[in-house]
Amino acid sequence: MKSSSWQTLDWGALDRLRQRFLEGASAGGDYWTSRADLADYDFTFAQRIGWKWDAVLGELQRRGWTAPAGRPLIDWGCGSGMAGRRVLEFFGMDRFTRLQLFDRSAAAMEFASEKAREMFPGMRVELLGGAGPEAGVPGGGGAPVLVVSHVLNELDEAGGRALRQVIDVADVVVWVEPGTSADSRALIAMREALREQFVVVAPCTHQAGCGLLTAENARQWCHHFAAPPPGLLADGDWVRFGQRAGIDLRSVPYSFLVLERRGLRSPLPGALPEGWSRLLGGTRVYKGYAKVFCCAAEGVHDLMLQKRDAPELFKALKSGEAEPLQRCEREGGRITKVQPFRQEG
């Protein structure tokens, strides 16, 4: 398969694609006018999505969670197939029986299948069809591991029903979206709707209702930040792309949700004991202290962390490299002691 390069990119086509992405579902129709559109997208915009998947998969690894073996992997709303390829690369193709691709665009499915076969020779790759509420619903082969990436702003009512049908037959859902308030709130709504059937693996440290649904947290949302690959910010081609696309490559916000069907595995790999919290995006760092949104089973609270109480965490917050999973002790609205998460063994 012929790949794109910085020398061959069609910048006009990338500008058009960027505008279509911003318009979302209101744009209608197919993004792609040619195979070259998909190749250029995969070389640029999709790489940024890949960094988000790297962050999510890295966290799952730190928690000790891995995908259950012997199941098909479905990349639903696959686009150029970045999400499915990242998952295959991370867990290994031998963990899955096949890769199944679905997208409303036939051209996207063909491109994604070619890229997958190129990267993973011998992997069985299938295209899922269907229309309306049956779109992308697998016909058999076992309960799948379902990956969903950047689809919420494109889904109409029929697409939402179709996705829910696939979720209802899946054993695992790994879902990544942009870190906007709207996308985060939509994922929270899905989390609440699915809590009876699924265990929430991540980003949450608990199984209680989402603390962001309270009136006092109405302006907050659950988002996180992925890091670009080392050295990328010194790469002139990527800098030019970021400027042209209006994207800050230093800040890669995302929201995500990982679910596993209740009773599938006991004990659940990566399950956290009680008492752990998650630091959400939106940290504000000042001289000598920081304000953090801390999510735990008892709710989401805006807390103060003084540098003298946790100098290592304060330094990591300042550099944007803090471990989000922490065990926090507090007095009122102040964190007095922290313990970063480290997987035992």
Functional labels for PLM-detected ranges:
Residues S80-D94:
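Conserved SAM-binding loop of SAM-dependent methyltransferases across substrates and taxa
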